[in-house]
């Protein structure tokens, strides 16, 4: 996806840390996009059973990743399914351009 207006926060990677960042950014009313090439949850999505996550006795990594995504999207974050191929920073505009398979995304900050 190519954006005309810069978003506030672009997050590269949809693992637990990426979605935690997306949740906090979205709660702060920042326009937020997570760019993930694989499955929600990142590497945790490949785990068959998660039994040590506080408050959740047992579920699969794929289910936990899906919950991360639903939580972030429920607060207004967007998710792009694409592989990031590069990131440029323009000192004049103070903006980042994230290049990925779906186009370019311009952002004020990148995590």
List each model region and its residues:
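Beta1/beta-strand and adjacent pyrophosphate-binding region of the FAD-binding site
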Residues: 2-17
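Glycine-rich FAD pyrophosphate-binding loop
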Residues: 27-46
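Structural motif
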Residues: 9, 31-33, 109-110
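Core beta-strand elements of the Rossmann-like FAD/NAD(P) dinucleotide-binding domain
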Residues: 5-7, 99-109
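Flexible, glycine-rich phosphate/dinucleotide-binding loops
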Residues: 18, 41, 53
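Gly/Ala-rich phosphate-binding loop of Rossmann-like dinucleotide-binding domains
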Residues: 22, 26
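N-terminal Rossmann-like dinucleotide/flavin-binding domain of flavoprotein oxidoreductases
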Residues: 45-104
């Amino acid at each position: 996806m190519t954006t005309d207006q810069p978003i506030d926060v672009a997050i590269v990677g949809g693992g637990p840390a990426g979605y935690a960042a997306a949740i906090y950014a979205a709660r702060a009313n920042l326009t937020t996009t997570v760019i993930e090439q694989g499955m929600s949850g990142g590497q945790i999505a490949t785990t068959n059973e998660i039994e040590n996550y506080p408050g959740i006795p047992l579920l699969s990594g794929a289910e936990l990743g899906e919950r991360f995504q639903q939580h972030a999207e429920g607060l207004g974050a967007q998710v792009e399914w694409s592989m990031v191929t590069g990131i440029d920073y323009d000192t004049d505009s103070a903006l980042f351009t994230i290049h990925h398979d779906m186009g370019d995304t311009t952002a004020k900050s990148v995590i």
